[in-house]
């Protein structure tokens, strides 16, 4: 069905877990910017090509993890914050982490943080960003060589991305939703809050940015956000009742 030029499709199924999808717009295969997960992005540092084996996943709303879960009441003035990069931090943890580079690996660091007195962690971008985008030259244009190296990895993730999806390369399993929620539950169980960094470049739609933060707050129980970039409306975020 549609309203004007806006089309919508309703899928009636007991479970959408087994299905994946993409869009094809003017002959070009593209991913849904509102996708809740991506299949085909499990390996970090691999160039992102939207037309090759990358598909969107539906949200698995049947995941468990919130039984008896209570968010820690960490006041700002009493916060002892540990900022980290999911992959880099757990890769360097050596003997302390068996699931290196992953959200699950972070849960193994909880005893260490408690020993330090940490009551909040801040994750550098952990949504699905493209660390090695493929820049295809436009048809009919000459390829101009520059000094920019090809396939340079954006290790830190401060770029646009799929803001509703946990980064699958940071997961030890094929269940990103379950693993991220498990991490949040374990943090909260031990009195540690989780804050996420989001980078919204200037071209980002402000309403989309708001919806993304609301989703992570509601579905993943993230405790707060450190928002960067120019692609969001500060007043809109400050006035929002969910955040």
Identify the meaning behind each predicted range.
Residues 2-85, 90-97, 101:
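The feature marks proteins involved in alpha-glucan
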Residues 23, 84, 113, 123, ...:
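Conserved, mostly hydrophobic/aromatic
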Residues 80-82, 121-123, 194-196, 225-227:
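Hydrophobic faces of well-ordered beta-strands that scaffold small-molecule active sites
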Residues 95-102, 133-189, 200-219:
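Aromatic- and acidic-residue-enriched carbohydrate-binding clefts of CAZyme catalytic domains
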Residues 108-127, 219:
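Catalytic domains of carbohydrate-active enzymes, especially glycoside hydrolases
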Residues 111-114, 181-190, 237-242:
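Surface-exposed amphipathic alpha-helices with a cationic face
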Residues 126-128, 199-201, 230-232:
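Active-site beta-loop-alpha junctions enriched in small/polar residues
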Residues 140, 158, 212-214, 218-243:
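Active-site-proximal helices and loops of the catalytic beta/alpha 8
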